[in-house]
Amino acid sequence: MSWPGAMGKRLKSCKLLFFFYPADFTFVCPTELEDLENHYDAFQKLGCEIYSVSCDTEFVHKAWHDHSERIAKITYPMVADPTHALARDFEVLIESAGLAERGTFIINPEGKIVAYEVNAGNVGRNADELLRKVQACQFVHAHGDEVCPAKWQPGAETLKPSLDLVGAL
C-alpha cells in the first residue's frame, strides 16, 4: 500500500489501525469509538496510530463531536471519507447504502495488511482484542520463526512451526 506525500512519510513510521464504521450519530459506533479511546494510550505505547473512518463528512464528524459526550472524548484522528475512496480501497464500501462496513485493518510499517476482519453491522468490536492482535502482529514481525497461538498474550508461550509439531498439538 502506498501513501502520498507527508502523510505517507508519517504513516510509514508506525503501525496503523484503520477502524471503519458505518456512520456518525448511530448506535453501536459510539460505543466502539469510546472503547478505542479508552485504550488509545496503550495503542500509542506500541507505536500504533488509530484512524477511525466513516463515509460522513468532516462537518458531520464535528457536529457529532460537539453533540456526544462519548465522541467528545476522542483524541485519535477521525477520517472523513465522503467520496468513499478509502472504503472502496479497503473493500468495505456498501455501495447501495454509501456506508462502510464495520472493518478493521492492522497495517505494519511496510504498508502490509497483517490482520483484518469485517463484523456484521450490528456487532461491535472489542478494543482489548484489537490491542492483543496488534501486539501479536508486532511479536511475529520481530520473531519471524515464531507464531502466536489462540488467546496469546504478551509474555505467553509461542510456537515454532516445524515438522515435529505436526499432529502434536
Feature map (PLM): residue ranges:
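Chalcogenol-based redox active-site neighborhoods
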Residues: 1-169
